[in-house]
Amino acid sequence: MLTLKLITEETDRVIRGLEKKHFKGAREAIDEVLAVDKKRREAQQQLDKNLSDAKKMAAQIGGLMKEGKKDEAEAIKAQVSQMKETNKQLEQQMNDAQDEMTRLLCPIPNIPYDEVPEGAAAEDNHVVKSNLKECGPNDTVGNWDVNPSLGIANPLPHWELAKKYNLIDFDLGVKITGAGFPVYIGKGAQLQRALINFFLAEAAKSGYTEIMPPTVVNAASGYGTGQLPDKEGQMYHCEVDDFYLIPTAEVPVTNIYRDVILDESQLPIKNCAYTECFRREAGSYGKDVRGLNRLHEFSKIEIVRIDKPEHSKESHKEMLAHVEGLLKKLELPYRILLLCGGDQSFTSSICYDFEVYSEAQGRWLEVSSVSNFDTYQANRLKCRYRRADNKKTELCHTLNGSALALPRIVAALLENNQTENGIRIPRALVPYTGFEIID
């Protein structure tokens, strides 16, 4: 949630940022917040004046009583009594205004950093890095410098490879649950487990503490990280208990620090978690949902950082380097994109996506988003810290990223490593799989 301080002190910058994010009615929304804040401040000013006057009147009452002017003292007492009733009304007005401001601020997204490019959708994102020798603007790919010896004519898509080698049964998942809930079998299941353990081990090497959180959260947690109300329609909701299945471990792990005041010495906090993730993905269809491309349940490792404002940009760079390192070790063709304002998430200030190239599908698949949320999530969470030399608390910066989401990584591994003799396992993964080839 945007801070009122930012909105009041940098109104024009906030409006420009919201417009960059293609938030409709940006100026009207901010004007409405400012109007309610004006009412709150007016009530606060009147309350402060009344309290000051009441203090003076109390001193007058004492003096009048000493002088034997009881009638005058009683008259002032009546005024003070009436003022107390007025003050109660003013306090209620302030509370109502605060509630109204929170209601108005809740659906307003975060504003992007200045370096975020203009643009309305994915086609306006900027490719900032790739390990491909050739990477055209329209998803055309030439030779890539990772495993050039593995290329074969007419590569099969991962859903055909999964069937050929008995790795994943999509039909069985439909029988048990429905579309988007695959069943992993044999080496397919072992590959999943190997990737999870590999990603967690790499996160530990980078200083992340592993958390094993619940995969069901309450509404307050969904609100804290910004999934609610923005993504309510995409989350599975257990209506009887008013619980939500998590779409990402970001939700429970970040909410550990909801309503917490940290000491400066505790920062940065670096946590990671493996969880199953659940997304309704309403409106997805066609090639986007084939095979592992888009699932309702999937495995993902998330990295989460909480840091001081002056350190968060460097923390973001470290997280980007961590995710890139994973893709390098998996020997996959990848690229990194800086998302434009219109393609950013509701809560992010800046976001980079990592995509891997699907050899058989001939297109890029997103496998990670790494975001800095500035104080936006922290303000909703009331996640603060206190500097060693200052009693006043400040909002933390929160960051997170996928490191990594498994389905499309598995798809890319199968497609990009298929040979005439089977599917090769990247060297870094062999200690975790216990086998070098799927045949």
Which stretches of residues belong to each language-model region?
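N-terminal alpha-helical targeting/anchoring segments
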Residues: 1-135, 140, 145
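TRNA-recognition modules of translation machinery and tRNA-sensing kinases, especially anticodon-binding
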Residues: 27, 133-439
